Regions:
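Thiamine diphosphate
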Residues: 136-188
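Conserved catalytic cores of soluble enzyme domains
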Residues: 1-56, 162, 170-188
């Protein structure tokens, strides 16, 4: 956070939630939220292990016996929740989603294809719950928050020469006064 939680207007002492993990995750200021220190370290190590050591490195390749051209019969039933679809197409169903609690209609993260790390950006129209049923539905429009989330991730991937895969099914742009304030900037 930038300001101390007790210095923010309307953030009264009993609340002071602007420094909390939930607030920061929903704001897009953190990539991953963990339950405890051990999980946080494991996720940090997982993320660091897939990234090139610097912007001039060629990237990280891993051994892969998963057939890139395999048939994925269940893929068609997961196209509305693209986080599930990305996991389906990735080597060994591995997907590291980032900023999962921010702009949930847009999915970003890393997958592996034929052993290579690939950035993935996709919009979703449904968020599936653990029971496999739609827990939340989204319009198939680009929002300002989703566009910023995607743009920052693509910029990050570009700075490390990580290729990006996109899965899109968009019918237009979100239209409201709030969206109009910044959507053009977010999309540029």
């Amino acid at each position: 956070f930038v300001n101390s939680p007790n210095a923010v207007d309307n953030n009264y002492t009993a609340k002071c939630n602007t420094a909390g993990a939930v607030f920061q995750a929903e704001s897009g200021n953190v990539d991953i939220v963990a339950e405890d220190d051990a999980e946080a370290l494991a996720k940090a190590r997982e993320l660091v292990s897939i990234l090139p050591s610097n912007n001039e490195d060629t990237g990280v390749l891993s051994e892969c016996e998963d057939d890139l051209n395999r048939v994925t019969a269940s893929l068609g039933s997961h196209l509305k929740d693209t986080a599930v679809a990305l996991r389906e197409i990735s080597d060994n169903n591995w997907f590291l989603e980032l900023k999962a609690d921010c702009a949930k209609e847009m999915v970003i993260g890393f997958i592996r294809l034929n052993g290579a790390v690939v950035g993935a950006v996709a919009n979703r129209s449904e968020l599936l719950g653990e029971d496999g049923k739609a827990a939340k539905k989204f319009d198939t429009v680009l929002t300002m928050a989703g566009a910023y989330k995607a743009a920052h991730f693509v910029e990050f991937c570009d700075s490390f020469s990580i290729p990006v895969l996109t899965l899109t099914s968009v019918t237009g742009f979100a239209s409201s006064v709030g969206e109009e304030r910044s959507i053009a900037r977010a999309l540029s």
